[in-house]
Every structure is written in C-alpha cells, then in structure tokens.
C-alpha cells in the first residue's frame, strides 16, 4: 500500500437565507457513499461529508479535495442555484431541520483517546447544536504504534488547529486531544 493520506471533512449546506439540513439533498450514506470523481459524497447528520480517494502526494491531496468540493457545489446548484456549502465549525439548527431521525445520529463509530487508550463518550443530541468536523486518514505499512502516530498528529495538526478554530461549541462534542478511530490501513 505504501503511505497514503485522505480525509472526510464535513460542511454545512445553506440556501439564500440560512443553514439548512442536507438530509435528502446530498444522497449517499456511511454504508453507501455516493461515488464522484476523486472521492465520494454522503449525508452525515444534517451535514454534507466529502471523502477523497487516498492520495500519494500533497498535490494529489489538494487536487482531490478541490475536485470533490467542486462536484458538491455543482450538485447543490443543480438542485437549486441558491444552495451552496459553507465551511464553519458549528451551527444552531432550526427545529424544522432536525425532524429526520438521521439528524439525531451522532458518532457512527466509536472513537478513542490516544493519550488514555480509553473510548471517548459518544455525543448525544441534547440541543440543536450541530458541528462540522472530519478526519485525516493516514495509511501506512510500517509497524508503528497507531497511538504514537495519533500523538504526533496532535502536536503537528491538533495544536495549530486550536489556534485557528476559535469555535468553543464544536469542542463540546468533538475534536478533543488524541481523538481517533482505529482503521485497518493505519
């Protein structure tokens, strides 16, 4: 396999007036993501989630993210020209956008804390707060302790992102230090 990098960021959907639910607009699911060139699209709670085909280089990584986001925008515009995606960490959703049972699904898979080795508590839908996040996927063949890789990512990615992301609401649900989901590829 060699070393590869991928990601699955989430974005909110908006119309001309406000942030809306992406349920029924995006298509695709965790079990059956919608294939597009360079990756996938799917609904995740009220958000749109993109996934990219794992990249071998930094250039490939950037190109694939840009490509899939462009296809998401085209898809949204084909439904309604006022629809677009918006990159922000959290939003308080109107009740009307939380009617679907899918809007109450949080944390499809358990995640763990690399520092403690313990499973993190699964977020519960207690308010209308929804948060956008995502994961960096790192694939490798090396016999390296996954938790040590995650700890290194905390230092190289996590600490700088704390300076960039000033949204305290998102941190209430996701994105704590050392959070990861074990995968067979790394």
Label each residue range with its predicted role.
Residues 1-186:
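Phosphate/nucleotide-binding catalytic core
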């Amino acid at each position: 396999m060699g070393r590869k990098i991928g990601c699955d960021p989430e974005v909110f959907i908006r119309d001309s007036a406000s942030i809306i639910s992406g349920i029924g607009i995006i298509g695709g699911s965790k079990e059956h993501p919608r294939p597009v060139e360079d990756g996938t699209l799917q609904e995740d709670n009220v958000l749109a989630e993109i996934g990219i085909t794992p990249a071998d280089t930094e250039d490939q990584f950037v190109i694939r993210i840009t490509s899939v986001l462009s296809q998401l925008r085209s898809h949204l515009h084909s439904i309604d020209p006022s629809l677009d995606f918006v990159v922000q960490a959290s939003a308080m959703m109107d009740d009307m956008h939380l009617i679907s049972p899918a809007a109450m699904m949080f944390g499809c898979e358990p995640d763990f804390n690399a520092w403690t080795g313990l499973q993190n508590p699964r977020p519960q839908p207690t308010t209308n707060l929804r948060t956008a996040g995502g994961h960096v996927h790192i694939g490798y063949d090396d016999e390296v302790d996954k938790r040590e890789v995650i700890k290194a990512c905390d230092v190289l990615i996590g600490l700088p992102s704390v300076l960039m992301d000033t949204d305290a609401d998102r941190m209430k649900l996701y994105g704590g230090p050392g959070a990861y989901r074990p995968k067979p590829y790394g």
